[in-house]
Regions:
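Phosphate- and other anionic-substrate recognition elements at nucleic-acid/protein interfaces
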Residues: 1-172
Length: 172
């Protein structure tokens, strides 16, 4: 008996407080799981432990779903904007989170890094969610923009789905 290898993709939209994650079957182009990952409650005080907790959870999900490909959104350099994020150190914290997640590459066949502009161009989050709303509501009952249930999907989860959609279908 020949067993076909599964091609599974984890798409990730990180932030310093939580992150959006989606897992796909690349062969069938089906979304298998979407989730908002929070740090474990006892990890909320230390930024580094918080990042490690989220990264560890991604590793567990990748084992459960036998993920062998990842695509991770990484921050862009803010030449003009982003003063508040720069002053509070948020960008450095986000880079730390991304670095921990990127280390998953050693257990993956591929690990792609994308910038926000790289996968959605200049498109605002709301426009991206509106573009995907009908398809993802019909297939998975995911309310990307809040029009079907008045409860909008978390932006990190929405972006994780968008990143995976971009990787699998080539555009948003």
């Amino acid at each position: 008996m020949i067993v076909k290898k599964k091609e599974r993709l984890m798409s990730i939209d990180p932030s310093i407080n939580n992150l959006g994650m989606a897992i796909w079957d690349m062969t069938t182009k089906k979304l298998l799981l979407w989730k908002l990952v929070h740090p474990k409650t006892d990890m909320r005080k230390n930024e580094y432990e918080k990042a490690l907790s989220m990264s560890d959870q991604l590793r567990e999900w990748s084992k459960i779903y036998v993920v062998n490909h990842t695509v991770l959104e990484v921050p862009e350099h803010w030449a003009v904007g982003g003063f508040e994020a720069r002053e509070t150190g948020s960008i450095a914290k986000l880079c730390f989170v991304c670095g921990l997640i990127y280390s998953m590459q050693y257990s993956m066949e591929t690990c792609e890094l994308v910038s926000p502009r790289g996968w959605k161009g200049q498109m605002p989050k709301e426009v991206m969610a509106n573009r995907l709303q009908d398809e993802y509501w019909a297939k998975y009952q995911i309310d990307m923009n809040g029009t079907a249930t008045d409860k909008k999907l978390n932006e990190n989860v929405s972006d994780a789905i968008g990143i995976g959609h971009y990787k699998i279908f080539g555009s948003v």
